[in-house]
Amino acid sequence: MTVDRCLIIRRDSNTLSQEYAKICADSVERCNMKSEYIKAVENLGVEDAAASVGMKVDWEMAEILENTITDHKECQEMGNVCCTASHIKAFRRVVEIGKPCAILEHDAYVMRNFRNFEVPDNYLVFLGPRMRDTKTYVPRSRVRRLIPVQQAIGTHAYAITPETAKGMLKHLEEVGLVYGIDHYLFMNNESKVPIIAADPYPAICWTRKSTMNDVKEEVDGPRGVWGGQNDKNVLGITTPGLLEGLGCPIYV
């Protein structure tokens, strides 16, 4: 089956998130697709965020992961754990709908209608990378093929089927909410669900001011605009076959 709709994760208490989500929803509508909002989990610590989506926390596993996954400690920060819980809410909604859906974070931007391909069970379909803005990249066509990749950057735009969502929910219920969603899906692929990338990419994430500045905790380190995938000092994770479809410069 093709994607039925886009599920846009939105922080209802944050004005910036609402603005970004509206831009995202408008881009979906312009591409003749439908969308709905997923109310994000906000301002909860690890255990409360997990409980809000029916999950537990395995602290022993979290400690093991902290010693084996680079930067895993940040997965337990409020903003990141709430983001993970929000994606779990989206997984559950996909199961409720009973049809494939695209899950979009509020800063995603859809460039072309992507209801022209079947979303396969037990795969993560990566829909697009980060870009500096919404004008740098224009896909040359609708999605022509799906290419296997080992990993990708960002959880801002991807598609899954109800079967895939059920499998990930079952796994997360077993291990608990210990993974950050980036590590779980695309960066480390701890879910073990194979990744395929749409070629050309039909969606992007655009560089913007972060909405994580208002989380109710003291966190060391930078917050705000992040554009690492367009930084020549950061290796871009991509596949040569995707470059033709990109039709724009990308550092590799």
Predicted regions and their residues:
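An acidic/histidine-cluster motif and surrounding catalytic segment
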Residues: 1-104, 108-252
